[in-house]
């Protein structure tokens, strides 16, 4: 995930991997949509980049969500997300509320993410809540 985060051009680079049985299935990083008021605005979070890559074919099929979850086997995967600071130290990368909602809906049961102390926290998504707003969400919703 660190190698992926290093590819990001954003102010807060995030990298993510989706693993299954100890094997990396797919990796990704956060990407910008455009420059808005001279700042990079995040359009695609790292965790959603990974999920989009893994799920793109199945999600286009006209199946109900339960069937898609079964085919994808995401319940057996772990989603890992990290953030790098300017000096390449780990920072807080707990998914925002929107990403957490999507992660749960797709049936991912475990998530690992970095915190501000350089640790990786592993949680069962059933008990993982997030009211965190990404910086891009704050920029578009300044009353946060």
Regions found by a protein language model. Give the residues of each.
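Zinc-dependent deaminase catalytic domain
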Residues: 1-144
């Amino acid at each position: 995930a660190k190698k992926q985060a290093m590819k990001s051009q954003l102010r807060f680079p995030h990298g993510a991997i989706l693993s299954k049985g100890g094997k990396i299935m797919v990796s990704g990083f956060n990407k910008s949509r455009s420059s808005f008021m001279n700042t990079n605005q995040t359009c695609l979070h790292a965790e959603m980049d990974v999920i989009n890559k893994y799920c793109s074919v199945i999600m286009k099929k006209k199946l109900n969500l339960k069937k898609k979850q079964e085919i994808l086997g995401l319940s057996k995967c772990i989603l890992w997300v990290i953030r790098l600071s300017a000096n390449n130290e780990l920072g807080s990368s707990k998914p925002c509320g929107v990403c957490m909602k999507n992660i749960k809906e797709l049936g991912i049961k475990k998530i690992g993410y970095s915190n501000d102390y350089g640790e990786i926290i592993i949680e069962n998504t059933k008990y993982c809540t997030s009211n965190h707003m990404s910086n891009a969400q704050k920029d578009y919703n300044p009353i946060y």
